[in-house]
Each structure stands twice: as structure tokens, then as C-alpha cells.
């Protein structure tokens, strides 16, 4: 069983469209990373390439199965329908 450093909502990650990768700052100074493809495949663990820490990504798996990108948080409370 993995020991997670933290559990982080996908909305708190930064998304890079070019690499289709979500990033979140790691305490070591690098970034945790998880690709959109990983999320579409049901993965929920983001790793840091510079240290041994891992975090659990909290996200709606159904939304990623529809091939959608989760936008940054906004004030719009309207639900997205698949």
C-alpha cells in the first residue's frame, strides 16, 4: 500500500496543454506530475521526478472518461454534462 504525502484536488493542479500534463508543487522544489492520459486510464497517483514523494489526485473519473480537460477553478457553478 502506498503512503501518500497528500491528497490534492485536480482543480488545484496547473495544466500544460502542450504536454497534456497536470503539475502540482512538491515540497522539494520540483513538481508532482500526472498526464491527462493517465487520468483517462483511471490512474490517481502523481509522482515527483526529483524525490520519492507521491500524492493522490482527487478527480471525477467519469469526466476524464469523456475526454474532457478539467478547467481551472472559476466562479461559474454550472455543471458540465457528458
From Swiss-Prot:
Q: Which GO terms describe its molecular function?
A: electron transfer activity; ferrous iron binding; iron chaperone activity
Q: Name one GO biological process term.
A: tRNA wobble base 5-methoxycarbonylmethyl-2-thiouridinylation
Coiled-coil regions listed in the entry = none
Provide the cofactor list for this protein: Fe(2+)
Where is Fe cation annotated to bind? 26, 28, 48, 51
Q: Provide this UniProt record's keywords sorted from A to Z.
A: Cytoplasm, Iron, Metal-binding, Nucleus
Q: Where in the cell is it found?
A: Cytoplasm; Nucleus
Q: Does the keyword Metal-binding apply?
A: yes
The effect of disrupting this gene, in the record's words, is: Embryonic lethal about 11.5 days after fertilization. Decreases metastasis in a mouse model of melanoma.
PROSITE patterns, from UniProt? DPH_MB (PS51074)
* Span of domain DPH-type MB: 4-60
The record describes the protein's role as:
Required for the first step of diphthamide biosynthesis, a post-translational modification of histidine which occurs in elongation factor 2. DPH1 and DPH2 transfer a 3-amino-3-carboxypropyl (ACP) group from S-adenosyl-L-methionine (SAM) to a histidine residue, the reaction is assisted by a reduction system comprising DPH3 and a NADH-dependent reductase. Acts as an electron donor to reduce the Fe-S cluster in DPH1-DPH2 keeping the [4Fe-4S] clusters in the active and reduced state.
Domain comment? The DPH-type metal-binding (MB) domain can also bind zinc. However, iron is the physiological binding partner as zinc binding impairs the protein electron donor function.
Q: Which PANTHER family match?
A: DIPHTHAMIDE BIOSYNTHESIS PROTEIN 3, DPH3 HOMOLOG-RELATED
Stated family: Belongs to the DPH3 family.
Protein's UniProt name: Diphthamide biosynthesis protein 3
Gene symbol of the encoding locus: Dph3
Amino acid at each position: 500500500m502506498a503512503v501518500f504525502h497528500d491528497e490534492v484536488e485536480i482543480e488545484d493542479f496547473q495544466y500544460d496543454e502542450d504536454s497534456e500534463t497536470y503539475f502540482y508543487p512538491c515540497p522539494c522544489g520540483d513538481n508532482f506530475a500526472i498526464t491527462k492520459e493517465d487520468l483517462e486510464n483511471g490512474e490517481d497517483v502523481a509522482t515527483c521526478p526529483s524525490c520519492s514523494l507521491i500524492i493522490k489526485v482527487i478527480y471525477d473519473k467519469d469526466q476524464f472518461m469523456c475526454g474532457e480537460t478539467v478547467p481551472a477553478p472559476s466562479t461559474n457553478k454550472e455543471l458540465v454534462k457528458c
